[in-house]
Amino acid sequence: MNLFSFLGDMLHLGSMLILLFKIKNDKSCAGVSLKSQILFTIVFTARYLDLFTNYVSLYITFMKITYIAVSYYTLHLIARKYKFTYDKDHDTFKIVYLIASCAILSLITYDKTTIGIYSTFLEILWTFSIYLESIAILPQLILLQRTGEVEALTSNYIVLLGGYRAFYLFNWIYRITFYNWSGKIEMLSGLLQTILYADFFYYYAKSRMYGKKLVLPQ
């Protein structure tokens, strides 16, 4: 772990906690995409299924458990506790196509040098999670575009997610430069995710510059 990955982790965790605070404080999940949260929960479940079989450090274990716990709790709040505030009329993205596409792609591109059935299974899940994470924000961005105005905490949530991804891009550049690291899947997926955030960041920066509420074009 280096400073870039640590800061990325903190921004990632911060984004999740801000979203949790928004839902709990407002007692409402208005403006939050259940579809995106389902995708992120699948990402963490698939990526950290090795939780009890692959110990790296106390920090890594803690972060894995925290990501899984917070994502499932957020899902519970949206789908159960505050479901009467959920905007299902606008959150209609067909996520099954995203899941299926990432699953097929992971079966084609996973590291074939992995030895053993269980290790291969985990490798496929890890590859799948990388692909899925890169596009998991799509339903959320589309929901916000359909509704127009974006609440401050919701926009901060997305900005922190983008910041997390930016620091991880720096982390990968650092590892390539000093450790001859080769992670094509992570790099390509990270670039795709950054591109998806770019349009939102433009309107976010513009709203901050002029001190106005963030409004996305419909």
Curated annotation (Swiss-Prot):
Species this chain originates from: Dictyostelium discoideum
Pfam family, one: ER_lumen_recept
Major location (coarse): endoplasmic reticulum
Transmembrane segments: 3-23, 58-78, 95-115, 124-144, 153-173, 185-205
A cellular component annotation (GO) from this entry: cis-Golgi network
Cytoplasmic side: 24-57, 116-123, 174-184
GO molecular function, one term: ER retention sequence binding
Lumenal domain ranges by topology: 1-2, 79-94, 145-152, 206-218
InterPro entries named among the record's database cross-references: ER_ret_rcpt
GO terms, biological process: protein retention in ER lumen; protein transport; vesicle-mediated transport
Domain of life: Eukaryota
Gene designation per UniProt: kdelr
Lineage: Eukaryota, Amoebozoa, Evosea, Eumycetozoa, Dictyostelia
UniProt protein name: ER lumen protein-retaining receptor
Bilayer topology annotation: Multi-pass membrane protein
Keywords from the named record: Endoplasmic reticulum, ER-Golgi transport, Membrane, Protein transport, Receptor, Transmembrane, Transmembrane helix, Transport
Subcellular location: Endoplasmic reticulum membrane
Keyword ATP-binding: no
